[in-house]
Amino acid sequence: MKRNIFKTILLSACILQGGSALAQQEKAEPGKFSPTWESLSQYEVPEWFRNAKFGIWAHWGPQCQPEAGDWYGRGMYEEGGAAYKWHLEHYGHPSEFGFKDVINEWKAEKWNPERLVALFKKTGARYFFAMGNHHDNMDLWDSKYQSWNSVNMGPKRNVLGEWEKAARKNKLPFGVSIHSSHAWTWYETAQGADKKGPYAGISYDARVVTKEDGKGKWWEGYDPQELYVQNHALSGHAWVAWDWPEGTSVPPQSYYDNFFDRTVDMINKYHPDLVYFDDSVLPFWPINDTGLKVVSHYYNQNMKLHKGNLNAVVFGKKLEAKHKEAIVWDVEKGVPSECQDKAWQTCSCLGTWHYNRSAYEDNWYKSAETVIHMLIDIVSKNGNLLLSVPMKGNGTIDDKEEKILEDIAAWMEVNGEGIFDTRPWCIYGEGPSTETAIPLDGAGFNEGKNAPYTSADIRFVKKGKYLY
């Protein structure tokens, strides 16, 4: 224990000493947009996105390897929780086998991105999303500013690069989701230790393990603190600290700069058509303007690539009216009760965001019928649906997911003309489901709270002179 305490103090000193030394490296693209809400309000949603209506998302990374569901990299450090118990049984104690070691288990040995993207297109997707990084802070490309990336370790493949190539081959707009701003608070459970049992008081790996500890191990030469970023004070009130600054431990400037550099590096290399931020409004808003800087760079670069036309789409959550002038509102696992004036998107998934074997074994995937009903309702309200199809760590989807996609494809083949390229009518619908408004809960999360649809529920859209 004394050794762990000493190492923690030493690491904290190092992080404070070096925090201001790493200034922002990437340069922002100059142009029409500057990093203010007033400037970004010049944005107009491109018509291609309004026409697309349906996208599919490969929300896939190292947390899919255990096949134990969402937020595994956080939950494995929560004593007594489901992920913690699963981890003990399959990997060992998190003081000895941390999330860094789960990354080494992820090999993606059966991953065929071309086959999957072609399948998603056949299902009816008009755009495709890949995950660039999650809250676990591992970059899934040849990142210049995060050595814990998928080229250096895990599958040792440029995951984002291969997804991008497959999307371009299938002529699908390519999107990337970025979630890493929250690593600062998300990993805070890893600062702890068991309170009881044989490992009581022994620190989990994230707070105490050093680069020097890797000598002779698979991660030799890599600093776990670059992954975990946990040499800081704990946030004030647990996971209430999702929104900045709601009790959060505030990061230093070096953390913002690293986020900017990593995200701009990704944009400059892969030129995504869409970028999704898993953040309330934008990364670090309102305590820092890094998110605004990334968006203005992205818009300016996209205009440069498209001869003055802005074809890009950026998503954020929990947006106020002024924010909706600048970026597109994303609603997680939910749908607003009324038609929206501006284009928006629901993101949802067949099961859990990260692959969960129990969803397969216990048959609790959304059915094709459920997905189609969601899509029809969303499109009638001027929205798009981004559907995540959970993938195993080995890079495949299971047979039940394949069947759901096959059924969606069959429906789209007959009914797609009433979905794609449509616009809202003067009313979005009628029937029992329109009579009760189900309020959104924060970023969304009203999915499944409405009564089941019946044959009396009708939705309307228009295309040219035709009403559907």
Model-found features: residue ranges?
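Mature catalytic domains of secreted/periplasmic carbohydrate-active enzymes
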Residues: 24-468
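Bacterial Sec-dependent N-terminal signal peptides
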Residues: 1-26
